[in-house]
């Protein structure tokens, strides 16, 4: 075991490849023992490692004069040490009310936004924070008690991407006691935040009542938790990679605001990959800004939702995210405004773009296409009244079906094809000038259509449905 605080931190930094020489480091300094000790450690290494140090401090304005005194303390300390100091005062309570989040999440968002800004300003490679080994123990315990994702159970990361560089925590290998001793040896008198002793917070209760018992069993318990954290992170990285690979085969459609997947294909995945797959979708749609009210319980709800016997249904998630099941497909997307009825003429030849970005393209030809799948409609040119009209469905719509006597309700065709209700309103209905429904793209052709087998030399009107979507990957 190393005798000194500095040597222990040196070993930890080297073991985990925390930071490189000749780098600019933004150090988050609250004025408390942890961040002040981190600052002094980095200053001790500054000359040898050719570090550029910038201190950043946020006054969250939670504690009135006390928090303002913290800011002044940091400014005075930096002046004494000859270090660049960037500070800001943010009314976090106002921000919290404005965006409807708890105080801790609001403070974190404001603080990290400021750190990112300072990182950009000085072209820094790292943001260093003062979390230590006891923090790691408390964090893992708290997440186990409250529930979290597998990534969350791994606790605090030593190093993770942040802006164009990394957020690092060099002190995770030492305890709070060692930090306090280091401050005493340097005759530093840091600021003390009284809220750290309030038992209203889960973390503080764990610190006061649980952590001492763990340290009685093993004084180096923080090292065991740190090892557990690293193993969890390594395992999680591997499972995330597998989940990416599998989900890219499960997803059937993808856009910026919506993802659809095949439920049978999804359920063929193992449960660990299913949970991570749902998390990947949520990360993508929320753009990695997951609402604080979202938890592992929501992921379990989605998995249970897929197992229900009912063929359709929906779930509402925070931030207006809606999850809609329609038979064997499920769509994740943000609630959209009601689709307005539409009507548009389509010339021949010509092209129109639909509201979803897909296109209908018409042509006149004496030859029929070699590929006569559901994306193509062919009729004799003179059998159709022009112009063609593309519209939304209407009550009572019917069409004569190729190879069938009489007519059939459009509604029945949608139901048989298991088209979700919300998609029916935006589905294009192709009519001729007399109002006859001649084609429901991708679903049914009318009696006006000809087949490849019955086609002879003639003049044909051909419509192609061209989708902008391919099988979507959730990896950008």
Swiss-Prot record:
Organism from which the protein derives: Bacillus cereus (strain ATCC 10987 / NRS 248)
Similarity comment text for this entry: Belongs to the tRNA(Ile)-lysidine synthase family.
Recorded name of the encoding gene: tilS
Comment text on domains: The N-terminal region contains the highly conserved SGGXDS motif, predicted to be a P-loop motif involved in ATP binding.
Keywords, comma-separated and alphabetical: ATP-binding, Cytoplasm, Ligase, Nucleotide-binding, tRNA processing
GO CC, alphabetical: cytoplasm
Binding site for ATP: 30-35
Reactions listed under catalytic activity: cytidine(34) in tRNA(Ile2) + L-lysine + ATP = lysidine(34) in tRNA(Ile2) + AMP + diphosphate + H(+)
Subcellular location: Cytoplasm
Stated name of the protein: tRNA(Ile)-lysidine synthase
InterPro entries: Lysidine-tRNA-synth_C, Rossmann-like_a/b/a_fold, TilS/TtcA_N, tRNA_Ile_lys_synt, tRNA_Ile_lys_synt_N, tRNA_Ile_lys_synt_subst-bd
EC number(s) per entry: 6.3.4.19
Main location: cytoplasm
């Amino acid at each position: 075991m190393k005798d000194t605080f500095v040597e222990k931190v040196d070993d930890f930094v080297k073991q985990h490849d925390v930071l490189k020489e000749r780098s600019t480091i933004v150090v988050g300094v609250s004025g408390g023992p942890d961040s002040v000790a981190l600052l002094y450690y980095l200053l001790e290494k500054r000359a040898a490692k050719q570090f550029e140090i910038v201190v950043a401090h946020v006054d969250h304005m939670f504690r009135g004069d006390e928090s303002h005194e913290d800011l002044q303390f940091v400014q005075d300390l930096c002046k004494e040490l000859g270090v660049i100091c960037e500070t800001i005062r943010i009314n976090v309570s106002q921000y919290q009310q404005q965006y409807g989040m708890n105080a801790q999440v609001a403070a974190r968002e404001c603080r990290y936004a400021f750190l990112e800004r300072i990182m950009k300003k000085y072209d820094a490679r790292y943001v260093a924070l003062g979390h230590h080994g006891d923090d790691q123990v408390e964090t893992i315990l708290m997440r186990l008690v409250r529930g979290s994702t597998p990534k969350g159970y791994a606790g605090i990361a030593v190093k993770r991407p942040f802006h164009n560089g990394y957020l690092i925590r060099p002190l995770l290998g030492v305890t709070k006691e060692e930090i306090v001793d280091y401050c005493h040896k340097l005759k530093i008198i840091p600021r003390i935040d009284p809220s750290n002793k309030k038992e209203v917070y889960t973390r503080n209760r764990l610190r006061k009542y649980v952590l001492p018992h763990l340290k009685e069993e093993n004084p180096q318990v923080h090292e065991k938790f740190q090892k557990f954290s690293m193993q969890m992170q390594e395992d999680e990285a591997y499972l995330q990679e597998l989940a990416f690979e599998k989900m890219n085969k499960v997803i059937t459609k993808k856009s910026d605001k919506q993802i659809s997947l095949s439920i049978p294909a999804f359920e063929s995945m193992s449960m660990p990959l299913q949970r991570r797959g749902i998390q990947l979708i949520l990360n993508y749609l929320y753009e990695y800004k997951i609402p604080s009210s979202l938890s592992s319980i929501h992921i379990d709800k989605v998995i249970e939702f897929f197992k229900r016997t009912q063929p359709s249904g929906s779930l509402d998630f925070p931030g207006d995210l809606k999850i809609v099941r329609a038979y064997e497909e499920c769509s994740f997307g943000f609630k959209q405004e009601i689709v307005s009825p539409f009507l548009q003429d389509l010339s021949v030849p010509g092209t129109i773009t639909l509201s979803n970005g897909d296109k209908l393209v018409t042509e006149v030809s004496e030859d029929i296409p070699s590929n006569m799948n559901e994306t193509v409609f062919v009729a004799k040119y003179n059998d159709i009244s022009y112009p063609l009209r593309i519209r939304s469905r209407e009550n009572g719509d019917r069409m004569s079906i190729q190879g069938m006597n009489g007519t059939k309700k459009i509604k029945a065709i949608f139901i048989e094809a298991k088209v979700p209700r919300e998609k029916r309103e935006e589905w294009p209905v192709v009519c001729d000038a007399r109002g006859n429904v001649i084609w429901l793209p991708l679903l049914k052709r009318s009696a006006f259509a000809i087949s490849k087998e019955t086609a002879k030399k003639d003049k044909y009107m051909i419509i192609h449905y061209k989708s902008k979507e391919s099988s979507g990957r959730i990896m950008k």
